[in-house]
Amino acid sequence: SNTRNFVLRDEDGNEHGVFTGKQPRQAALKAANRGSGTKANPDIIRLRERGTKKVHVFKAWKEIVDAPKNRPAWMPEKISKPFVKKERIEKLE
């Protein structure tokens, strides 16, 4: 019931995908898994919370890690794990 929608924005203010999550961080992790950022060169993810003027700005990257020991059969041995780091919140005018 308290799922929030976050819209992915680019530098020009175009809005692309919608990621859902209870927290902005949860949505950012989903977005990070689609990106191509690395720890040395992270992506910048800008998520606008739908219905608000707040844009959550994250640095995002993913690393290839070993899958957990108890992974389901369909999961490969190496998985990409997303990381996000909150930078700031911007207010839209």
Swiss-Prot record:
Record-level GO BP terms: DNA protection
Sorted UniProt keywords: DNA-binding
Gene3D superfamilies, per the entry: Chromosomal protein MC1
A Gene Ontology molecular function term of the record: DNA binding
Region (Disordered): 1-44
Function noted in UniProt: Protects DNA against thermal denaturation and modulates transcription.
Protein name: Chromosomal protein MC1
Cross-referenced Pfam families: MC1
Top-rank taxon, per record: Archaea
